[in-house]
Amino acid sequence: MKKEQVVNCQFSVWYPLFKKHTIKSLILPIPQNVIDYLLDDGTLVVSGSENNNSQTQANNSDSDEEDIQWTDDETTTTVTAPEFPEFNVKVQEAINVLGGCIFPKLNWSAPRDANWIALNSSLQCQSLSEIFLLFKSSDFITHDLTQPFLHCSDDSPDPTINYELVLRKWSELIPGGEFRCFVKENKLIAICQRDYTQHYQHIGKQEASISTSILQFFRDNIQYQFPDEDFVLDVYRDSSGRVWLIDFNPFGEVTDSLLFTWEELTSGKNLTANQTQEETALPDGPAFRCTNSEVTVQPSPCLSYRIPRDFLDLTTGEDAYKLIDFLKLKRGQQEEEEESNEEGEEPQ
């Protein structure tokens, strides 16, 4: 895997080429001070919200006496999050353009390993503060910012990366409709269900039609149009059988090979379908693998990512002030949602 392949898989590189085949998205350059904030290993205090209006303060007046008085203890230091008012305005405007709810990511990765921290265990965001909460809790995002060229074989200097916040219009995607496709020398050689930790009966039953529709989509819209001849693409097949492009990834170890191995994919040896699927495999078509029974269901790989030290402290009671910060953030988010509901606003 070469560094150029990684560069070509950046969202801003491929989106202009394939935007009519994917989810509507907006791309915003990230200021350096925001990048510094995301890389800060300090206490998880989330910025990006400017909703401390007088109405909220009035609603909280009855409970002011119960709040922790930070200034009463001279040994206590108040930890406040930096604010980025100009960036916050741009992000909120973009979110509104996309309907009010978005799915965030950086140049390459989304914070899929951090959905456990969200109130609804979802990557759906409506504000910059919610995006920051996910980003600062994600090892995937940290990898993008610090080691984007890990596993690259060339010794050339690392290309300069201009980091960007990608906001994708929120869409309810059924995990059983997501598939990862492996392309070598501009040929689709393998397809695998994206969420291989679960068994979806419809995938096994519709394997032939799924393979056919994905292969046709690849030939009509992707083949020979991506800058590299070796790459990985994620697609979504909806209930009507239409295929949508979701993402591109480098063809190499930095990308999860799911139910295949990288030795199989790079050598082409033993690159076959599951034994139970060989009868339905397309002649000269891609190898197709899926989790074919409940017996082979596996735990999600995201469960292996450790909880940040800050939250370990919360559970053990070692840092009460971090717990207070976290609870105040959650209370603020809940109050904002309640105010929106009272005003009759509904997410689009």
Curated annotation (Swiss-Prot):
Pfam families: D123. InterPro entries: CDC123. GO terms for biological process: eukaryotic translation initiation factor 2 complex assembly. Residues 49-68 are annotated as: Disordered. One of its GO terms (cellular component) is cytoplasm. The keyword Metal-binding applies. It is found in: Cytoplasm. Keywords: ATP-binding, Chaperone, Cytoplasm, Magnesium, Metal-binding, Nucleotide-binding. ATP binds at K105, W108, A110, R112, R168, K169, W170, E178, R180, R194, D234, D247, N249. GO terms for molecular function: ATP binding; magnesium ion binding; protein folding chaperone. Its main location: cytoplasm. Residues 49-61 have a biased composition (Polar residues). Mg(2+) binds at D247, N249. ATP-dependent protein-folding chaperone for the eIF2 complex. Binds to the gamma subunit of the eIF2 complex which allows the subunit to assemble with the alpha and beta subunits. Belongs to the CDC123 family. PANTHER family: CELL DIVISION CYCLE PROTEIN 123 HOMOLOG, D123 PROTEIN. This is Translation initiation factor eIF2 assembly protein. It comes from Danio rerio. The lineage of its organism: Eukaryota, Metazoa, Chordata, Craniata, Vertebrata.
